[in-house]
Amino acid sequence: MFIKKDRKLARQRKHLRVRRRLMGTPERPRLSVYRSLRHIYAQVIDDTRGVTLVAASTLDPALKGLESTGNITAARKVGELIARKALAKGINKVVFDRGGNIYHGRIAAVAEGAREAGLNF
């Protein structure tokens, strides 16, 4: 019980440290990624206005036919979807916010999928 709580607290502290250095602007918004056990969520945020510009997740209707929503292939699809939505709104450069997680596995898959679809980091 305590280990799980400590791990969550450590991730939150890491995220605060990362967020001190990252700031999304209108020219280069922040691509924030959140990972739960079953799903993965990504959103492009303009921090100066405090507005979410684009959002995508494994719960999105465009990704309805996925076999599993908590694996690397689903995360890559979310990355591709968020990139397509961002490019449609005229956003082609972002700052990647890993959300206190290690840049590995599903977090890295979102970034790779977004890069492959044309988003620049």
Curated annotation (Swiss-Prot):
GO-annotated cellular components: cytosolic large ribosomal subunit
Q: Which SUPFAM superfamilies match?
A: Translational machinery components (SSF53137)
Gene Ontology BP terms: translation
GO MF annotation list:
5S rRNA binding; structural constituent of ribosome
Its annotated function is as follows: This is one of the proteins that bind and probably mediate the attachment of the 5S RNA into the large ribosomal subunit, where it forms part of the central protuberance.
Quaternary data: Part of the 50S ribosomal subunit; part of the 5S rRNA/L5/L18/L25 subcomplex. Contacts the 5S and 23S rRNAs.
Q: What is the name listed in the Swiss-Prot or TrEMBL entry for this protein?
A: Large ribosomal subunit protein uL18
This chain's source organism reads Moorella thermoacetica (strain ATCC 39073 / JCM 9320)
